[in-house]
């Protein structure tokens, strides 16, 4: 802000020392004391060469300190605390005007240079009042322009009167005037921060009675007259010096009283910056946390989608398993149906083969044991013919009548003999026709009604006519029909008993029952019982007993020699 309000004036750029370090000031005071003592000794005695070299080194150090002090005064407007220290150093230099570095210059030049700084202080205070008045009237006056005008005016005025006899009076005056005017202007602005553009300088308690009734022309004439009488003032510089010292002390007090708490303002600025940075960091942290929350929500959404996807995959797998189970069950059902159809066809084939085996056994039994019984049955018809002849009936008529009766009797006998065989042959034909078809099943009504009743009754009559035991044949026949009924009703159970359980897969399970009775042994037993044992028993035992059939077999085996 100071850089914007107070642009730097064209001044020599020298090295700026640290104003916070108070050690050079103390060294300067000690050097001044040493200089005074050295000057007294120089007047009394002539110094040696070693003392001259030491004196030259001290002179050079004092010159450097003076240059640093002058450059420090030119940059005093950078901070209020530094300006206070600079005023102190200026007053200290005014109180100790003797410099060994000025020993080579004339007394008039040294006195003119000493007067340049107090004159700059006083004119700066006067110019500050003028600036305050102009600002109060709404007219802006630039400090740099005013400094350049005053410096040029003083330099030309003194050059016209005294020439180049005043040395660096103009330079010291310009530096002092510029720095003091900037300090006073900054002090007024700090005292009235809300009226920086219209500043009247009333807060610093300066006495304006000397300028309230003066115009700008009168002020300029006074300034010119003060510049022209500078050499006269040099002659009585003791009074002016004391007056300038008091003015410097007053300006120092005024400067210190008008200096604002800049350190506290800087601390507040630092705290505000820290708070702003902390707020910005908190905002960035909030944004980062928001992004992390959004990322976590995205991850949560992704996990939810994965969970739903896994559920859908699980449902798809369950559906596939259900489809596979349904297909397996369907295949198993189809396989069971196929096995059942195959088993039904096999049972019908068994029945057909069993009927043929039974007929062959019946023919063998009739041929060996029932021929005499058939002759006895037909001889009944001959006896009735002989008994039917009478005396009153002619022989021709009686012979015709007896022949007819014999024929009728024999037809009845042969019909009884072959009726059962005819029924069995018809039954066998139907079985053969049904077994040749595909996907044919034997109904229960057919087994119960046709096989059990009609075939059983007709077969019993046939066996009785042939001279066999019809009741025994009927019992064995009913057992055979019962086995056929069970085989047709429990087809899959019979299939499992003979071939094992129906498996969809090709897995082999070792069953204890299977290890004890192999399936081939079971099939062999079923085949022997249904296809050989029952038909042979039903065909042979009604015509002869088991012992008679044993003797018959032994007779034929031994060639018929022992058969009686």
Curated annotation (Swiss-Prot):
Q: Where is the composition biased (Polar residues)?
A: 12-28
Q: Which PANTHER family match?
A: PROTEIN CPR-5
Which effects follow disruption of this gene?
A: Plants are more resistant to pathogens such as P.syringea and P.parasitica and develops spontaneous lesions.
Q: What InterPro entries does its record include? A: CPR5
Q: Which GO terms describe its cellular component?
A: endoplasmic reticulum; membrane; nuclear envelope; nuclear membrane; nucleus
Species: Arabidopsis thaliana
Region called Disordered, residue ranges: 1-87
Location of this chain's protein in the cell: Membrane; Nucleus membrane
For membrane topology, the record states: Multi-pass membrane protein
Bias-annotated ranges (Basic and acidic residues) = 29-38
Known partners and oligomeric status: Interacts with SIM and SMR1.
Q: Where is the composition biased (Low complexity)?
A: 69-84
What is the role of the protein in this entry?
May play a role in transcriptional processes. Negatively regulates the senescence and chlorotic lesions induced by biotic (e.g. pathogens) and abiotic (e.g. sugars, darkness) agents, probably by controlling programmed cell death (pcd). Negative regulator of plant programmed cell death (PCD) and effector-triggered immunity (ETI). Promotes cell division and endoreduplication (e.g. in trichomes).
User: What tissue expression does the UniProt record report for this protein?
Assistant: Ubiquitous.
Q: What is its main location?
A: membrane
Keywords carried by this UniProt record: Membrane, Nucleus, Transmembrane, Transmembrane helix
Report the record's Gene Ontology biological process terms. Answer: defense response; leaf senescence; photoperiodism, flowering; response to ethylene; sugar mediated signaling pathway; systemic acquired resistance; trichome morphogenesis
* Transmembrane spans: 347-367, 411-431, 443-463, 472-492, 526-546
Protein name per the record: Protein CPR-5
